[in-house]
Amino acid sequence: MRSCEKQIIYLIGCALNDTVPEAAVIDDIDLEALFRLANAHTLAAITCIGLEKGRAFDSAPEDTAKKWKEAKDKAIRKIMLMDAECRKITEYMKSEHIRYMPLKGMVLKDIYPRYGMRQMADYDILYDSSAQSKLQTFMTGRGYQGKGFETGVHDAYYKPPVYNFELHRALFGESHGAVLDEYYKNVSEKLLSDDGVCCRFSDEDFYIYMTAHAYKHFSNSGTGLRTLVDFYVYNLKKGGAMNREYLQSELELLGIADYERESRLLADKLFAVPKPDILDSLTEDETALLEYYLGSGTYGTVSNRVSKKMTEIQGDGKPISGRTKLKYILSRLFPGRQWCKENYPFFYKYPVFLPALWIYRIFRGLVKRRKHIAGEIKTVKKANI
């Protein structure tokens, strides 16, 4: 494991526990390499706080120190702007009696020890999908550009300089697996509300959803170190009062109990008591799990996603065969009708036009996604035969 990976874990632990890092660790840090790693996992702000506690910037090059501090300040500024904008959006929802619920990071960011410590890429809100058209009019009227209104499970809205909202019509879709899709199909039955409009999960149900969402990424393209930090912070803040019997039964029902337990225990070991050599105490399984998190970045990698899909196609646990690679390539070039259900509903409804979609995707890939396709092809080639 690289030294910067050990250092970022230690520094995050120091930031979370308000502990001053050891001078020997600070003196050995490559701030440029650490910055690249922190950015890859959307952890620059919390890592910067750890570095500031150790006075790491006192002797650092001016431009390097400036880069770190700007990253932290921008993360805080974005949350301030997004919070203010979110209040405008939710005030509108309340005025129109549109039921909604803040999701994921919107809840997590407020239980971290310091404001701005958890960086945010976007704000996620579940809403009553019957109000989609009304919300679309409101958001575009505020200067947002939107997409995804007929695909997937959320509508994405963007506005300069930093505004990014995902308004969810559902928490999971068919593409995320039948178990998760079915469990959350009637999510309104699990919601609590004081005014009948602004909703929330119980602490237990939020944790179950948070774990399910993390596992969705973990089991597909992967999820990064920030997920482990979320596990630690949430359990530190809420864990003692949660009904563990209920949690266990629901997590087992979803098939993610082992994932939750292993991630929770690993997170606690990494961050509860900051130690520079904490990784030396990990078991072989814990080390492998941590390496997967570290290798995934915030939102996973193409390599993880491709490898998982080819393993599913192979089906027998043996090394990936040439036949499997060919099947994978064909599935990417010529996706079937079921895949279109969430991604291109028109072609799901009218499959006779599928060839037009195939041609469009191929040309779009060649023009706009060459780098992505090259990475995917490289992963397919590297798979063991």
Language-model segments: residues:
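Conserved NTP-donor binding/palm subdomain of two-metal-ion nucleotidyltransferases/polymerases, i.e.
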Residues: 1-121, 127-385
